[in-house]
């Protein structure tokens, strides 16, 4: 039914307008107790065998919503209602900003992909922190907070901007993510170089520890799929050195060649980050390389091109303790989370692994 609705309605709408329309429906459903309970019972099944622990946090399962969908933390319970075991909000910047001019979001339907150049449009760290502080949680959902650089802040002052966001948001975050990999903020990806990344991550870690003294807020970094292999290794080594809790692999790609894209050339040439199915192979490759480098010393989160339970399972075998999705949600609709959970539970039952944790990195260990 959703796929028919997508073809007849959403496909004819501007992608960003369709996003906000769907978003309003999700928020509305989450506000009505009877409807919320009914939807969660139907779309958010719980499987004991999928229970997951990552960086000290317990979750119903490994499957979460990637950053970018709920930028301002307005629908955390709504997304949990749809079956996401954790919700990563943001990207949130130190100061509010409108993002890049519209049109800035494009569907590549034949490729089951998106191109976006949103530019971190969000209400800013102060407003999002206030909303999280006032939130009365309906569902027990792990909330990650993804932070990025305000566009007008010079690159040399980036650490101060990230620290500002950390000081405002850390106490409301189950985990924090430093996003240095979006292609839509000029100069941001330069911060992935270890000489820039080391002081940035150190500053954020210190700010989080200074702000939240009653617990240690897990800190992760999100990297691009376009990094060279040597740079991936360097980030992995730095994460171990600094005692980071995790790495998220990967963000969107600026590449277009070699992806077998079938959409109209005018769409393919749009500037921005490409996400969805064409990213699958490279994101899996980056994840496997990271796990081979860090093993179980750091928690890995697999994202990029995950469309179904088999994709999620392959990420787990490649080293991901958690998996995330976003683009396929646009194409698959509200039953997507349920399908991922049911498929993963079935896959685990027919596998040689007693627990989901046993499966993490199994393929990489076999090939070592």
UniProtKB/Swiss-Prot annotation:
Q: How does it assemble?
A: Monomer.
For this record, the Gene Ontology CC terms, alphabetical, are: cytoplasm; plasma membrane
Q: Does the keyword Membrane apply?
A: yes
Q: What is this protein called?
A: Dihydroorotate dehydrogenase (quinone)
What Gene Ontology molecular-function terms does this entry list? dihydroorotate dehydrogenase (quinone) activity
Taxonomy, superkingdom: Bacteria
**Keywords in alphabetical order:** Cell membrane, Flavoprotein, FMN, Membrane, Oxidoreductase, Pyrimidine biosynthesis
Q: State the family it belongs to.
A: Belongs to the dihydroorotate dehydrogenase family. Type 2 subfamily.
Cite the binding residues for FMN.
67-71, 91, 146, 179, 222, 250, 276, 305, 326-327
Q: How is the cofactor bound?
A: Binds 1 FMN per subunit.
* Binding-site positions, substrate: 71, 116-120, 179, 184, 251-252
Annotated catalysed reactions: (S)-dihydroorotate + a quinone = orotate + a quinol
Name which cysteines form disulfide bonds. none
Pfam short name (any one): DHO_dh
| Cofactor(s) essential for the protein | FMN
**Membrane topology per record:** Peripheral membrane protein
Coiled coil ranges (UniProt) are none
Q: What does this protein do?
A: Catalyzes the conversion of dihydroorotate to orotate with quinone as electron acceptor.
Q: Which HAMAP family match?
A: DHO_dh_type2
Which residues does the entry assign to the active site, renumbered to this chain?
A: 182
Subcellular localization is given as: Cell membrane
Q: Which PANTHER family match?
A: DIHYDROOROTATE DEHYDROGENASE (QUINONE), MITOCHONDRIAL, DIHYDROOROTATE DEHYDROGENASE (QUINONE), MITOCHONDRIAL-RELATED
**Matching InterPro entries, A to Z?**
Aldolase_TIM, DHO_dehydrogenase, Dihydroorotate_DH_2, Dihydroorotate_DH_cat, Dihydroorotate_DH_CS
Q: In which pathway does it act?
A: Pyrimidine metabolism; UMP biosynthesis via de novo pathway; orotate from (S)-dihydroorotate (quinone route): step 1/1
Q: Name one GO biological process term.
A: 'de novo' UMP biosynthetic process
Cite the EC number: 1.3.5.2
